[in-house]
Amino acid sequence: MRRTGPWDDAMRLALTEAQAALAADDVPVGAVVLDASGTVVATGHNTRESRHDPTGHAEVVALRAAAAARGEWRLSGCTLVVTLEPCTMCAGAVVLARVDRLVFGAYDDKLGAVGSLWDVVRDRRLNHRPEVVAGVLADESTALLDGFFARHRSAGLR
């Protein structure tokens, strides 16, 4: 039996959210916000295409839902688990929401802002720097994304 890491269950839930994005023909990225005890506060997936919203990234959707659920925009004590390394917008949202920990699956060498292209969350000029855990179930996240983009390329879409 394969040993699992401490973030695997939450990442599997994020992957389920990514599947929901895929079903809506959106880029399959999913996110989960956990409170300090590990309880799920909110989930989200990409809605950029379905809602015609440039800010409809899984991380932003989940952070908004978590803030609404908690009645507080400061998400101190929370962990954001997301299937893909956040972009600059989403990394900025993590910092601004005061999330304690960011856990992500696959690295994004085209848009990643948590170490790949930029490192927004570790920038010492900012007032908050969350802990980062990278590469959790990265192969599963990558396979989902690769399949999506291969289908879109072969169909001549986006």
Name every feature range the model reports, one short phrase each.
Residues 45, 57, 128:
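Histidine-centered active-site/metal-ligand motif
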Residues 50-61, 65:
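A short, polar/charged loop-to-alpha-helix boundary motif
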Residues 24-28:
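Short, flexible loop/turn motifs enriched in small residues
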Residues 29-38:
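Short beta-strand scaffold segments in enzyme catalytic cores
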Residues 42-48:
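Short beta->alpha transition motifs characteristic of CBS
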Residues 14, 18-21, 31, 42, ...:
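Small-residue (primarily alanine) positions within well-ordered alpha-helices
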Residues 1-21, 40, 89-158:
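Zinc-dependent deaminase
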Residues 72-84:
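Immediate flanking context of iron-sulfur cluster ligation sites
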